[in-house]
Amino acid sequence: MKMPDPARRERQRALIERGIETPFFRDHIKVFDKAFGEMEAQLGKTKWLASDMFTLADVEITPYVERIDRLGLAQMWEDRPLLADWFARVKARPSFKAIEDFPPTDFYDDTGRDGLKDWPRIKQMIAA
């Protein structure tokens, strides 16, 4: 599949090839941090993101949170206990099994280690 936007394609390629060294990584990680803050605030009001029932809102954001987790960056919610609890409840759902089975876990072994190694620098980027 060809990505129609050449600029987006180049950003994606740079992120894959150079990771946190790309000039726009800081912007991307700050978007996640802001979203996680908003999720924490909402979870102070409701059990799930849109209500007290599991809804499409939870389904839609789960792959993004799961990706951050697999990249070894779960520290992003270490000070967000409601988000951590939400994600634990999502992972406990039978429907989450399909996400865990794809792609093969060895794909994330190196990226997870890199995320843990790079966390101090990433944390500084978020704070800046």
Model segments located where?
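GST-like fold's C-terminal all-alpha helical module
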Residues: 1-88
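Long, positively charged, glycine-interspersed low-complexity recognition regions
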Residues: 84-128
